[in-house]
Regions:
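Alpha-helix/helix-capping structural signal
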Residues: 8-9, 40, 78, 118
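Structured helix-beta-strand junction loops
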Residues: 30-34, 67-68, 89
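Active-site neighborhoods of divalent-metal-dependent phosphate/nucleic-acid chemistry enzymes
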Residues: 71-115
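Histidine- and aromatic-rich ligand-binding microenvironments
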Residues: 3-6, 37-39, 93-95, 116, ...
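A general alpha-helix detector
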Residues: 9, 44-45, 64, 82
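Short, well-structured N-terminal submotif of metal-dependent ribonuclease cores
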Residues: 1-37, 50-62, 126-127
């Protein structure tokens, strides 16, 4: 099974003071699934890490991604088409979360690792009744 990983999870893993840190760390320690990070998540995580935790935290994240600790999923043209559909239907959902929905549908992934329960719980997917949100 594969899991798409959202920004909040990656940030929480790095920030020991984050409210989600412990739960996220415990989940990450136990998960055996393929972790897929949409390419659209990378700049968002990098920005948060650099602005809140500093350059060293951002560098550590980039190095772990470069080392293959997660799989990076590219954005495809069809994802952008679906992304626009999601953004039109759900105006509160922004670009990054919309691309996660589009990639989940394209890859037929039902599980999303996220701290953003509100957005992903409201989306009606084309391939599953509801996303399984972890941790």
């Amino acid at each position: 099974m594969a899991v798409l990983v959202d920004t909040g999870i990656l940030y929480a893993l790095a920030d020991e003071d984050d409210a989600w840190h412990e739960r996220t760390r415990d989940w990450a320690d136990d998960v055996n699934d393929l972790l897929i990070v949409p390419v659209t998540v990378l700049p968002e995580v990098s920005y948060l890490l650099h602005s809140r935790l500093g350059a060293a935290a951002e560098l550590a994240f980039v190095q772990s991604a470069a080392a293959g600790e997660v799989e990076i999923e590219p954005l495809r043209q069809q994802d952008l088409t679906r992304c626009a559909d999601v953004m039109r239907r759900y105006p509160d959902i922004g670009f990054v979360d919309s691309t996660i929905v589009a990639m989940a549908e394209r890859l037929t992934i039902e599980t999303i690792a996220t701290t953003d329960r509100r957005h992903f719980a409201m989306v009606k997917s084309r391939h599953t009744k509801a996303y399984q949100l972890v941790p």
